[in-house]
Structures are given as C-alpha cells and as structure tokens.
C-alpha cells in the first residue's frame, strides 16, 4: 500500500526511499553507469563537466549509503538468527500461546494467524473473557488465568501441555500500566505491574522453553515498548518492566546459542510506540508525522510476519524508534530523552 494504516508518516517516506533511491539494486548500477559515462566523456574531450561530476558524486554517496544499509540489515538478520535457517515451520501443526489475547494486540495477532492458517492451534491466556467470537471451526483454546499468581501460572502451563500440547510459539503480550508516579503509586500497583509485565513472561518462557530447546525449534515473542528506551511520565514501573523484558530477551539470545546449543529457537522483540488499544484509549498528543498513534493491526501484522518468516528480529514501530534507540543507548544523551518526553 502507498500509505500506512496511520496515514502519511515518516515511515511511509522512509519506505519509499528504501525501495527506490536507497535500493542498492538500483542505485549501485546507476552510479556505476555514471562513472562509465564520465570516464568515456572525459577521455574523449580531456575536460570534465562540473555539474556532471557533482551528480556522479551524489550518485556514488547514495549508492554507498544503500549498500551500507543493506549490508547492515543482512548482518543484523543473520546474526540474530545464528546464521541458521529452519525450514520445518508449519503453522497447521505449531501450537501458539498468546497472553492477553482477549483484545488489543493479542487479538490482532490471532486474527492475522487465522487469516493465513484457519486451523492453527492457538491458546489464548487472559484474565478477561474473549471480546471476540472465535471463527467457526477454528482451534482456539481459551484459558482464564491470573498471571500475577505463580501457582495459577504453573497450573495453567500444565493444563496447556496436557490438553493442547507443548507450545512452539509463545507471545508474551499481556501487560498493564497503572499510570501513577513513583511517589503516588501503591505497593499493589507496583507489584501488579511487575508481576504481569515481567515476572509472568519470565516464568512462561521458563516453562515452555525446554521443549523448544530439545527440538531446536520454537519462537518467543516479547512485546516491548519505546518506554524502555525513553521512559515517559507516570509509568516508571511499566517502563522498568519493559526494560527488564528487553534485558531478558537479549540474555536469553546468548544462552540459546552458547549454553543450550539451540540456535534455531527464534526470538522477536517489539519496540513499539503508543498503540490504540484498551491500554491507550487516548491520543498521547505526539507529532503525528514522526510518532503516530499506531493502529493495532500494524503491530499485529508485523509480529505475525516475523513468525511466518522463520526468523527472529527486533521490530521498531514507528520505524524512527530504531534511530531513537541508537541515540538513547548513550546514557549521556539526556537532551534527546528530555525532548522526546516533553513532546
């Protein structure tokens, strides 16, 4: 599509540029052609054309930029997946667990999976009842569970394994935000946020990972947030849990490769801006062109695309978040974080 679900944004412009000007299959041959023409022209006349030389330099810089971008993307993709492929993925046979699947991002993920595989085995884990009707003939299994209760979570995992099977895909999506300052929030607010957003994903991963490691096959998706990079006001506990989720993701990536010797177990991390869900029913008031309020299906589709690709990755939405993450990783860059928070 020419535009995104969010309308005309910087991501749309970036996609246009990436598919045209910054496409190395176009820019490199073009720059090479200009170089050949320039060499022949200068050789024949013994003179150089300033305007032509300027165009040639610009074409060379664009070609170089496109080559660097493509090379970086290539290295990021394969290093994140341990330079291995897994051709055994079959979503008619996989068992997918989605926490927080009764609405929002979780529902969108399930919807996009069913659009590709109507008979996919999907386990929905949520404390709230389903806000949608499962399609007739679909293999949707709903389990009600309070993920803040470790005993209930342990029982849940046993039930899933005995009634459905060992999951091969785990989507840690469930999350809450209480919306209080550090000083105003109660002990209960902090505990609920940390248990739901960080401890539950950690324990669920711990429960289902052994089967994935034994078979060297699986995919864990962690739904993160830009707040782990640029923490906004009033959700310090939420931001801390999302930063912890990112740390778990990165540490597990190393453990899978070097300790468990399961290089084909994939991981995907989503770094998302504000998304129009029950968690964010309001417009945060950020500049739409740079930081649009994301459509829930943009997020769900991106996650499902990653699952069906057979490769793990880090998803940045809006795309500008990748640049923000690179800059904000420098803890001395307080000006950037303050500016983004103020906006």
Enumerate the language-model features and the residues they cover.
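Rossmann-fold cofactor-recognition segment
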Residues: 136-150
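Active-site loop-to-helix junction immediately N-terminal to the catalytic Tyr of the SDR YXXXK motif
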Residues: 185, 231-239
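SDR active-site lid
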Residues: 256-319
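Canonical Rossmann dinucleotide-binding motif of NAD(H)/NADP(H)-dependent dehydrogenases/reductases
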Residues: 77-121
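Residue(s) in the substrate-gating loop at a strand-loop-helix junction
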Residues: 225
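Rossmann-fold scaffold of SDR-type NAD(P)-dependent oxidoreductases
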Residues: 99, 165-175, 197, 222, ...
């Amino acid at each position: 599509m020419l535009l995104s679900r969010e309308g005309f944004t910087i991501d749309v412009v970036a996609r246009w540029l990436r598919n045209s000007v910054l496409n190395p299959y176009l820019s490199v041959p073009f720059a090479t052609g200009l170089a050949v023409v320039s060499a022949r022209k200068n050789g024949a006349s013994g003179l150089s054309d300033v305007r032509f030389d300027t165009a040639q330099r610009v074409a060379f810089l664009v070609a170089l930029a496109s080559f660097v971008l493509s090379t970086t993307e290539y290295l990021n993709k394969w290093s994140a997946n341990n330079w291995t492929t897994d051709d055994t993925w079959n979503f008619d046979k996989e068992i997918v667990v989605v926490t927080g699947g009764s609405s929002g991002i979780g529902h969108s993920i399930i919807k996009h999976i069913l659009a590709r595989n109507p008979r996919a085995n999907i386990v929905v884990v949520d404390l709230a009842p389903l806000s949608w009707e499962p399609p007739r003939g679909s293999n949707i299994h709903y389990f009600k569970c309070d993920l803040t209760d470790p005993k209930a979570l342990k029982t849940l995992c046993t039930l899933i394994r005995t009634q459905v099977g060992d999951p091969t895909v785990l989507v840690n999506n469930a999350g809450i935000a209480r919306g209080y300052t550090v000083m105003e929030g109660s002990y209960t607010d902090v505990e609920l946020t940390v248990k739901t957003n960080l401890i539950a994903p950690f324990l669920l991963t711990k429960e289902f990972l052994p089967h994935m490691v034994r078979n060297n096959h699986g995919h864990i998706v962690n739904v993160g947030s830009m707040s782990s990079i640029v923490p906004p006001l009033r959700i310090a506990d939420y931001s801390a849990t999302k930063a912890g989720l990112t740390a778990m993701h990165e540490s597990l990536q190393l453990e899978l490769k070097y300790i468990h010797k399961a290089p084909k177990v994939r991981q995907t991390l989503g770094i998302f801006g504000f998304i129009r869900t029950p968690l964010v029913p309001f417009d945060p008031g950020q500049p739409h062109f740079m930081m649009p309020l994301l459509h829930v299906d943009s997020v769900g589709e991106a996650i499902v695309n990653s699952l069906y690709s057979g490769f793990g990755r880090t998803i940045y939405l809006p795309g500008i978040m990748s640049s923000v993450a690179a800059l904000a990783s420098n803890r001395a860059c307080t000006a950037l974080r303050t500016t983004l928070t103020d906006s």
